[in-house]
Amino acid sequence: MIVADTSALITLASIDIFDLVLEEFDIHTSVTAVEELEDTAEYDDSHGKAADGVLQHRDQFTVHDASRTEFQSSRIDGGEGSCADLARDLGADFLITDDLRALPELQTLSGTQVAISPIVLRALVKRDVLDEEEAAAKLEAAAENRDWLESPIYTKARDLF
């Protein structure tokens, strides 16, 4: 089971792979993350379109009310905090986020493995659903869509391949 926050869901939808992710994995998120997706979907840009794409699949992933302890800090917003709580409560295998700065704190809060969304591409390769070349191309598309080029998250993601 994977718990994914807003940023990870947007990234996966932005590279036209969200359908495949939903077929291969049991995806969960929080009500707060869905609210953030709804806010983002209001924008007429690539992130808004990706957020809308996630929302169009709302019936294919599980949304939980995880707002009872919704943790926030200078590095963790409400969506990330609620997803960390959710991952801990559900005993998720992974919490997926694209907020590299928040990774260590989310790891402590969630009590599970925390990774950036390109780990899902790596998992799809291991499952023989994507080949290396296709996954690498999706990573490059994510880097462009999410403005990751030359950033630490892009470097970390490339290390997966």
Features from the language model and the residues they span:
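Active-site-proximal, substrate-binding regions of enzyme catalytic domains
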Residues: 1-92, 102-105, 136-137, 151-160
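Short beta-strand scaffold positions
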Residues: 96-97
